[in-house]
């Protein structure tokens, strides 16, 4: 950059420092989101991907991917707390359309509809909402096997009667035939707090270093401007 009077000031350093701080801020945000999601059921860790062009593109050179490893399994006394012990997602339907989730904390309404905690309908492997033809007095009368077949006890026949298979799909929406469903379990996040904090430290140091560089370069620019003012 050429300043009036013929004095030149290199602005690339300031721009590079600002861009680097923006990138570091985004990386810190991703890590903070993972730390916040540590104790959330069904949360999957986000991983920031830094491209080789990030130095020039800034935050536009960043992207995130989802770590689809299975999280921590914890036993639940609720028969409608269901988890997937493999990769995959439950399919649900709301007014906003079809969504996928790893959060298998379900409930039953008075009509026998299988719902998520936010009242979305849980879909079967045929893409239809699951509805029990018998609403049991005790949720323990509902059984779900490892292939996702939901059955309910019929007190009249004293037998379990199949209702539907839970619709479990992969990241591309393709149906998974052997999803390894576990009834009476909650899957907490696959986040490792130790790994998140370890990865956070160099990013914070890099942010602080770029902030110091920016302040130094900004002070130098102010001196140049001040000298120009004195010269005139």
What are these regions (language model features)?
Residues 1-232:
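Amphipathic alpha-helical polymerization modules
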């Amino acid at each position: 950059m050429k300043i009036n009077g013929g004095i030149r000031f290199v602005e690339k350093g300031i721009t590079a420092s600002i861009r680097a701080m923006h990138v570091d801020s985004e990386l810190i945000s991703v890590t903070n989101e993972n730390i916040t999601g540590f104790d959330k059921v069904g949360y999957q860790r986000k991983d920031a991907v830094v491209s080789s062009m990030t130095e020039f593109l800034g935050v536009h050179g960043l992207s995130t991917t989802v770590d689809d490893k299975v999280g921590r399994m914890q036993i639940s006394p609720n028969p409608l707390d269901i988890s997937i012990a493999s990769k995959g997602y439950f399919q649900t339907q709301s007014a906003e359309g079809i969504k996928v989730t790893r959060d298998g904390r379900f409930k039953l309404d008075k009509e026998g509809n299988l719902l998520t905690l936010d009242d979305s309908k849980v879909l079967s492997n045929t893409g239809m909402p699951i509805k029990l033809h018998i609403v049991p007095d005790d949720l323990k009368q509902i059984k779900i096997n490892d292939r996702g077949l939901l059955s309910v006890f019929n007190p009249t026949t004293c037998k379990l009667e199949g209702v539907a298979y839970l619709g479990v799909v992969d990241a591309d929406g393709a149906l998974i035939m052997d999803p390894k469903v576990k009834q009476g379990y909650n899957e907490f996040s696959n986040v490792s707090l130790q790994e998140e904090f370890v990865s956070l430290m160099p990013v914070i140091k890099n942010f602080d270093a770029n902030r110091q560089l920016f302040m130094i370069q900004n002070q130098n620019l102010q001196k140049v401007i001040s000298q120009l003012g004195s010269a005139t």
